[in-house]
UniProtKB/Swiss-Prot annotation:
L-thyroxine binds at residues 37, 76, 139. It comes from the Eukaryota. SUPFAM superfamilies: Transthyretin (synonym: prealbumin) (SSF49472). The modification 4-carboxyglutamate is found at residue 64. Belongs to the transthyretin family. This is Transthyretin. The lineage of its organism: Eukaryota, Metazoa, Chordata, Craniata, Vertebrata. InterPro entries: Thyroxine_BS, Transthyretin/HIU_hydrolase, Transthyretin/HIU_hydrolase_d, Transthyretin/HIU_hydrolase_sf, Transthyretin_CS. Keywords: Gamma-carboxyglutamic acid, Hormone, Secreted, Signal, Sulfation, Thyroid hormone, Transport. It is found in: Secreted. Gene3D superfamilies: Transthyretin/hydroxyisourate hydrolase domain.
Length: 149
């Protein structure tokens, strides 16, 4: 019974993250080629002040810092990059989960949650990376769309 409740909670949270990310992606921020959204699954609200770093894989096969930011009151980061700078390549979005949970007085299992993805290999796209966090798990989803003119 507890498993079913937990499963329903996770599914509801994923639906919430997917819906809110899609709504915001089509708003005034639709020209932003990379947007991040983070939800605190324990408290059922946006995760505020989560440090996020974006890395790009270099030709030498190392990760180079590409962009960084901190989630706002809506759990979002916009304007991490511009269309001109966000070229084809392999990217890694790193969510600093340990600092977020420790600031709330919680000892989490994960120190970071990483999402690695290939961008713009099939033409220019806009990406929303959404993460749902809890102290012992995380899940992510992505919305990939054509730019809005």
């Amino acid at each position: 019974m507890a498993f079913h409740s937990l499963l329903l909670l996770c599914l509801a949270g994923l639906a919430f993250v997917s819906e809110t990310a899609a709504v915001h992606h089509e708003s005034e921020h639709s020209k932003c080629p990379l947007m991040v959204k983070v939800l605190d699954a324990v408290r059922g609200r946006p995760a505020v002040n989560v440090d996020v770093k974006v890395f790009k894989k270099t030709e030498e096969q190392t990760w180079e810092l590409f962009a960084a930011g901190k989630t706002n009151d809506n759990g979002e980061i916009h304007e991490l990059t511009t269309d001109d700078k966000f070229g084809e390549g392999l990217y890694k979005v790193e969510f600093d989960t340990i600092s977020y949970w420790k600031a709330l007085g919680v000892s989490p299992f994960h120190e970071y949650a990483d999402v690695v993805f290939t961008a713009n290999d099939a033409g220019h796209r806009h990406y929303t990376i959404a993460a749902q966090l809890s102290p012992y798990s995380f899940s992510t989803t992505a919305i990939v769309s054509n730019p809005t003119e």
